[in-house]
Design a protein with these regions (language model features):
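Phosphate-binding P-loop
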Residues: 1-3
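Hydrophobic anchor at the beta1->P-loop junction of P-loop NTPases
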Residues: 9
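The conserved Walker
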Residues: 12-13
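Conserved glycine(s) of the Walker
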Residues: 16
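Conserved substrate/cofactor phosphate-moiety recognition/catalytic segment
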Residues: 19-76, 115-118
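Glycine-rich phosphate-binding loop used to anchor ATP phosphates in small-molecule kinases
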Residues: 55-100, 104
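Conserved phosphate-donor/acceptor-positioning beta-strand/loop module used by diverse small-molecule
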Residues: 100-119
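Small-molecule kinase domains that catalyze NTP-dependent phosphoryl transfer to phosphate-bearing small molecules
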Residues: 122-154
Length: 154
């Protein structure tokens, strides 16, 4: 049996990563796992800052890694709607697939700040989707580089 493929996304807040994730999961018949959905169901009232986000996001990662690897080993592809916006995040995601000898693809959703902020404000999540949060998160954003050995679709 061939392992499934791990699909993940790089792009700023509001760039359209989650919209693309939903579409690709549907098109490919893949399992969609969304960080935003998990965090909102488990920790909604507890996340009010970047520090809170990092704390609770890090709590999800070991469980998500194991779950995704089990799915991939059964030949089912996974669309993992978790950010791949820093080199360390991309390394974590690539390692999920590498450890079980699965392929991976990172979709880079490249949008300018103005478009991202406009989309972000349309979402209507006043606790997390703010211009201030956008800038606080975006200062850590880095585009994928060839040296990372990430299969990237631009």
């Amino acid at each position: 049996m061939t392992n499934g493929t791990l699909i993940f996304f790089c792009g700023k807040m509001g760039a359209g990563k989650s919209t693309l994730a939903k579409r690709l999961a549907e098109e490919k018949g893949a399992v969609l796992i969304s960080e935003d959905d998990l965090l909102s169901k488990l920790y909604a009232e507890k996340i009010t800052s970047v520090k809170d986000y990092k704390l609770y996001s890090d709590k999800l990662k070991p469980v998500v890694s194991d779950t995704v690897q089990q799915i991939l080993k059964r030949g089912v592809s996974v669309v993992l709607d978790f950010p791949a916006n820093t080199e360390s995040q991309r390394l974590w995601l690539r390692n999920i697939s590498d450890e079980v000898h699965s392929e991976h693809t990172c979709y880079f959703v490249d949008r300018n700040d103005e478009v991202c902020i406009r989309q972000l404000l349309k979402r209507g999540n006043p606790n997390t989707d703010t211009v201030e949060m956008f800038h606080a998160i975006t200062k850590y954003f880095t585009e994928p580089s060839n040296s990372e050995n990430i299969n990237t679709v631009r």
